[in-house]
């Protein structure tokens, strides 16, 4: 079969105009400004899928309050290691954002990031004992030194007033991290891409990538359908391709036919949130309050009562309530999941599914919940919430990674996964949380995998953007104070 003839060329093609592509394009444009890059988005604007503010929790994932990053072991101990890794990654992201604010790439930081304390709150003896053990494991670390723990109801009421209004008897425990943030990744994505337009980078909308053909010289022929005018369909020859299309990355990765893609599948999980925009309510809550996920529930289902800042307005979200649709994207197709099944991933997906029947049971239970049951769940965190003040909204799709495993046959993986070809000519990002908050370190990892010969040349400039690049802040208290103090000052956070 002959390959289609290219009508134009680009050094880099990035598929999907979300936070990942925007971050990678920003890095590459700074490191190689002469490279011609194209960002291709199938929808009519940037950041409309998982990067959109209402399609994610905007937590600024730094493992300050998300309890699933530090589960309790069978012997009762809690390790801070995974949480430290995530926090270190977020500090890398913060450093780059600070540099981009300073050089004018990003606008006033309060248009995309705001200080919102992160709170963990649990109920009952077992959960309270766990939270204390978690606090004891976290507190000695430099990155978590500002964390506080209490079971004092009056103090918790100061941290998160709505959670204690009308609360009945029973043990309550909470931790408080004042350095927490809320991030509008949709606004951030748009600012990055708007700045890049015209700087040897073109961002095009309504453009759907349909096929990827690898050439003998290592380049790729990228077939693009113009969704508004088929007369403009074209083929682009690209030296490097990045698939940053969220849930849409997996089908495109499969079309690339690289051997590294074999064994990968995806399991889509949808989510619903209750949202309150009444100023009389939102003014009383300035915290992200995270609880414990129910048994069998996926990590992204951890209940949380979240302060959000979107377009300068304050709101509160509660959720998520899990759901299932076979779409890989919110604006995707019901055929996404069945069409992704291949001979090479059928067994891993089957094995992963059999090992996660609790998840299936959880999703079935979530799908059958009534509105009153959802309000009951809200009342666990905001006892006096009035049902009439809350609207139900649909969040973005999260396509969890399913992949082959030598011991188990197949596993369901919560998190992100970078898949790159051996020659470094194509890379794809699969998975979900913590995702956007760790976009910068993930994209730096992609650069090291796909452009290893360039890293020594790029390193001095990377260190200008990210002063502590290559170093762990938690191991160097003085460096931590210097870096976190500077980024907090530039970004207007605590």
From Swiss-Prot:
Pathway, per record: Carbohydrate metabolism; tricarboxylic acid cycle; oxaloacetate from (S)-malate (quinone route): step 1/1
Keyword Transmembrane helix among record annotations: no
Identification of the protein by name: Probable malate:quinone oxidoreductase
MF terms (GO), sorted A to Z: 2-hydroxyglutarate dehydrogenase activity; L-malate dehydrogenase (quinone) activity
Biological process according to GO: tricarboxylic acid cycle
Source organism: Kocuria rhizophila (strain ATCC 9341 / DSM 348 / NBRC 103217 / DC2201)
Keywords: FAD, Flavoprotein, Oxidoreductase, Tricarboxylic acid cycle
Keyword Oxidoreductase part of the UniProt annotation: yes
InterPro entries listed in its UniProt record: FAD/NAD-bd_sf, MQO
Domain of life: Bacteria
Catalytic activity: (S)-malate + a quinone = a quinol + oxaloacetate
Family: Belongs to the MQO family.
Stored NCBIfam families: mal_quin_oxido, PRK05257.1-1, PRK05257.1-4, PRK05257.2-1, PRK05257.2-5, PRK05257.3-1, PRK05257.3-2, PRK13339.1
Cofactor: FAD
EC number: 1.1.5.4
UniProt enzyme class: oxidoreductase
């Amino acid at each position: 079969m002959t390959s289609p003839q290219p009508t134009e060329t680009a050094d880099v093609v990035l598929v999907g105009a979300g936070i990942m592509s925007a971050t990678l394009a920003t890095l590459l444009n700074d490191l190689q400004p002469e490279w011609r890059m194209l960002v291709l988005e199938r929808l009519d604007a940037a950041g409309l899928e998982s990067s959109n503010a209402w399609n994610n929790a905007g937590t600024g994932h730094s493992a300050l309050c998300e309890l699933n990053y530090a589960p309790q072991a069978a012997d009762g101990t809690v390790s801070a290691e995974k949480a430290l890794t995530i926090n270190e990654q977020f500090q890398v992201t913060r450093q780059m954002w600070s540099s981009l604010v300073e050089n004018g790439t990003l606008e006033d930081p309060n248009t995309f990031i705001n200080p919102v304390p992160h709170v963990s709150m649990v109920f009952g003896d077992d959960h309270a004992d766990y939270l204390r053990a978690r606090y004891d494991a976290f507190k000695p670390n430099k990155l978590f030194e500002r964390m506080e723990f209490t079971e004092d109801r009056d103090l918790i009421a100061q941290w998160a007033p709505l959670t204690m209004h009308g609360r009945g008897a029973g043990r309550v425990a909470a931790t408080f991290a004042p350095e927490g943030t809320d991030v509008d990744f949709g606004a951030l994505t748009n600012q990055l891409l708007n700045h890049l337009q015209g700087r040897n980078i073109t961002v095009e909308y309504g453009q759907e990538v349909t096929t990827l053909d690898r050439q003998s010289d290592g380049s790729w022929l990228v077939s693009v359908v113009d969704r508004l005018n088929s007369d403009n369909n074209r083929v682009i020859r690209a030296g490097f391709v990045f698939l940053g299309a969220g849930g849409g990355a997996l089908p495109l990765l499969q079309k690339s036919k690289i051997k590294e893609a074999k064994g990968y599948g995806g399991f889509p999980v949808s989510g619903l949130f209750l949202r309150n925009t009444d100023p009389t309510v939102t003014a009383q809550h300035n915290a992200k309050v995270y609880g414990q996920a129910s048994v069998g529930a996926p990590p992204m289902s951890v209940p949380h009562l979240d302060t959000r800042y979107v377009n300068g307005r304050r709101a509160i979200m509660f959720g998520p309530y899990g759901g299932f649709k076979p779409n890989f994207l919110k604006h995707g197709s019901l055929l996404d999941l069945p069409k992704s099944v291949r001979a090479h991933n059928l067994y891993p997906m089957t094995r992963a599914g059999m090992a996660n029947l609790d998840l299936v049971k959880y999703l079935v239970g979530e799908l059958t919940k009534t509105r009153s049951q959802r309000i009951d769940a809200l009342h666990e965190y905001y006892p006096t919430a009035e049902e009439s003040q809350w609207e139900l909204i649909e969040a973005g799709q999260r396509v969890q990674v399913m992949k082959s495993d030598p011991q188990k046959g197949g596993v369901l993986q919560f998190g992100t996964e970078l898949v790159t070809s051996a020659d470094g000519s194509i890379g794809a990002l699969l998975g979900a949380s913590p995702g956007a908050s760790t976009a910068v370190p993930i994209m730096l990892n992609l650069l090291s995998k796909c452009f290893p010969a360039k890293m020594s040349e790029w390193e001095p400039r990377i260190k200008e953007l990210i002063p502590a690049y290559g170093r762990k802040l938690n191991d160097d208290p003085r460096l931590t104070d210097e870096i976190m103090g500077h980024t907090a000052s530039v970004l207007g956070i605590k």
